[in-house]
């Protein structure tokens, strides 16, 4: 055989073997998933116990004029119950035609019906299956108001020249743009063909080719099986910059260089996580910086994290977002919550991993600051939540799963894992986590499955240590156990001392040594300042103005004898001997540090929140600009809530919201509509 011929045959053989390995991998994953007992998912109409979707082939035309996706979804199915129909989740989809086939060709029309719509769940699409049907083809289009899509005019983008569209599928919004089994219990592989205006680029949570020509016709393949909420699409005027051998960033041309500089440590983060928890199993890890209306800080879409531009601080101080979304490549994407009441399995693990990544890349001090801020966030949330919403294994029956997205699954979940780490030792707990990710890789699991694995592979090894961790209290009870870890930061102690000196009049604001402060130190400084208390705060936090948990609550809540409760968002971290912050002192800080005009989103948010409470009017124009220019729910919801506490504030909030509402994502609109009782 000639060398050239041998090389061609070798390449063919290699390609064939790769495809066989991929097929075997998908079959193994499918078999493993089917072997797990199905948990009831109250947020899906689908029936995967009878008919399970294995693979999707998607084909869309993207119409910016009509604000719709129009095309076809072909579903490859496994018939576990030959008598059962296929039931899919939809929300405001226009179903034109449904066909079935035994072979993937020669499709014939089959009967289908769309059931009555529910405000939260959408409507079931029930499809009658012929005896030998293995493929279902659905011709459909989306609605211009689809909750999982946002269509942006050029004026809403950084470049101001081209429109932009992006999806947000978590928790149950995939059904608004794809007819599918919209439950995290079902994992699918997929391909897609996307046609767009020729000058725009389409990217997906799939294999993206960084150097693909912008020709308006794009093809994608996702070989790893993912749940529906991790299917993602974006279309816009995008450029790419490489960050490392398998990492990069997409963004609008006027943003991409700034984003590349901000995220330049991404490859280091991937390597650090692999050293801790095993190989990265998704091929490439890229980021996409979206326009500012994106409702979240980030979304962990596999292979392509969607990120808010509000983290582009210029000093890498907010890249904990990257660490968080990267960590999801292990916790959430690799091992997934089976239902949305198990959400803490995604987010609590991810916050814990995020801080371990930050420590590995930036040092222990950074981790300590992030953990201390996280504990503060958790305590603030616990001050306002009902007991039923303080539970990790939360009951969301009859509720929108987005309602479970407080700091509880994130910070309480991470604190529970920190408790396990501190009790059993970091080295032992790291080995446990690595084995956990390997054991449940590419599966969706319940809280009970995790607890069984925890008992068998960690707790039972040392009953005396296990007795120190009240697992049931962490998982099923409100509040925080009394022996929970209490993360502290020596850097924050120094910040508090400077705040005290200024408030006591020992130094002027301009003399506070802030030159080397990080964003985290600035945020802690502002949070530690004593603010006037509103009525709601007094109800929850009578007599407690320290940074420690209140021993008991007055008013509507009573502390359980075995747990700590929380102080309110307005509390300070200083002692009672300092004065309450007022308009004059706000003005002094503003003059010294120009906080009203801060371009750092975290600092600006905290300052504006304080300005509303103190009625610091010089910040009001910036407040309006902030609320109109970004749609990140983490920032805008608390600001509207604070405004709505007074009649004049609510009037201001409504005036701003009238301007901002058309630019917000549907997820943010739903949240603010509720805050302001918008009609």
Regions found by a protein language model. Name each.
Residues 21-30:
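Bacterial N-terminal signal peptides
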């Amino acid at each position: 055989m000639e060398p050239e011929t041998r090389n061609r045959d070798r390449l063919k053989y290699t390609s064939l073997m790769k495809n066989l390995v991929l097929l075997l991998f998908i079959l193994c994953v499918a078999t493993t998933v089917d072997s797990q007992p199905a948990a009831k998912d109250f947020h899906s109409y689908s029936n995967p116990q009878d008919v399970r979707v294995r693979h999707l082939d998607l084909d869309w035309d993207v119409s910016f004029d009509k604000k719709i996706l129009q095309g076809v979804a072909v579903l490859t199915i496994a018939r576990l119950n030959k008598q059962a129909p296929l039931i899919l989740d939809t929300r405001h989809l226009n179903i034109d035609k449904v066909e079935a086939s035994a072979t993937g060709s020669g499709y014939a029309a089959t009967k289908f019906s769309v059931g009555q719509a529910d405000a939260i769940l959408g409507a079931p699409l029930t499809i009658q299956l012929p005896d030998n049907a293995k493929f279902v083809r659905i011709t459909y289009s989306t609605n211009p108001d689809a909750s999982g899509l946002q269509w942006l005019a050029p004026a809403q983008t950084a470049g101001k020249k081209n429109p932009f569209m992006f999806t947000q599928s978590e928790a149950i919004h995939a059904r608004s743009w794809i007819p599918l089994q919209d439950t995290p219990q079902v994992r699918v592989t997929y391909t897609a063909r996307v046609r767009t205006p020729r000058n725009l680029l389409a990217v997906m949570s799939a294999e993206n080719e960084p150097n693909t020509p912008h020709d308006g016709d794009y093809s994608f393949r996702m070989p790893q099986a993912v749940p529906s909420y991790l299917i993602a699409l974006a279309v816009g005027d995008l450029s790419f910059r490489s960050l490392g051998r398998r990492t990069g960033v997409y963004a609008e041309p006027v943003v991409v260089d700034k984003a590349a500089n901000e995220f330049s440590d991404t490859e280091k983060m991937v390597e650090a996580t692999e050293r801790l928890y095993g190989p990265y199993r998704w091929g490439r890890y890229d980021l996409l910086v979206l326009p500012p209306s994106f409702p979240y800080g980030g979304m962990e879409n596999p292979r392509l994290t969607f990120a808010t531009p509000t983290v582009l601080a210029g000093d890498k101080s907010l890249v904990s977002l990257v660490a968080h979304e990267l960590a999801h490549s292990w916790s959430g994407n690799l091992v997934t919550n089976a239902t949305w009441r198990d959400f803490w399995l995604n987010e609590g693990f991810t916050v814990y991993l995020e801080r371990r990544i930050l420590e590995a890349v930036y040092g222990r001090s950074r981790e300590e600051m992030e953990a201390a801020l996280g504990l503060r966030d958790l305590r603030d949330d616990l001050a306002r939540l009902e007991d039923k919403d303080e539970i990790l294994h939360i009951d969301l029956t009859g509720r929108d799963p987005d309602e479970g997205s407080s700091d509880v699954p994130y910070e309480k979940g991470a604190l529970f894992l920190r408790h396990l780490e501190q009790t059993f030792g970091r080295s032992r707990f790291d080995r446990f986590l690595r084995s956990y990710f390997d054991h449940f890789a590419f599966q969706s699991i319940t809280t009970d499955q995790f607890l069984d694995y925890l008992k068998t592979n960690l707790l039972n090894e040392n009953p005396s240590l296990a007795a120190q961790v009240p697992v049931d209290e962490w998982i099923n009870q409100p509040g925080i156990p009394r022996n929970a870890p209490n993360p502290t930061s020596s850097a924050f102690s120094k910040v508090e001392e400077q705040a005290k000196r200024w408030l006591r009049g020992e130094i002027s604001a301009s003399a506070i040594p802030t030159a080397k402060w990080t964003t985290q130190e600035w945020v802690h400084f502002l949070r530690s300042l004593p603010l006037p208390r509103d009525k709601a705060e007094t109800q929850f936090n009578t007599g407690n103005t320290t940074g420690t948990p209140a021993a008991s609550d007055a008013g509507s809540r009573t502390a359980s004898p075995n747990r700590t409760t929380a102080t309110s968002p307005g509390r300070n971290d200083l002692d009672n001997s300092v004065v309450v912050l007022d308009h004059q002192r706000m003005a002094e800080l503003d003059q010294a540090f120009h906080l009203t005009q801060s371009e750092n989103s975290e600092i600006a948010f905290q300052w504006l929140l304080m300005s509303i409470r103190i009625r610091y009017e010089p910040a009001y124009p910036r407040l309006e600009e902030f609320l109109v220019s970004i749609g990140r729910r983490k920032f805008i919801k608390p600001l509207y809530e604070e405004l709505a506490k007074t009649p004049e504030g609510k009037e201001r909030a409504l005036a701003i919201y009238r301007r901002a509402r058309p630019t917000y994502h549907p997820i943010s609109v739903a949240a603010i509509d509720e805050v302001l009782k918008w009609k």
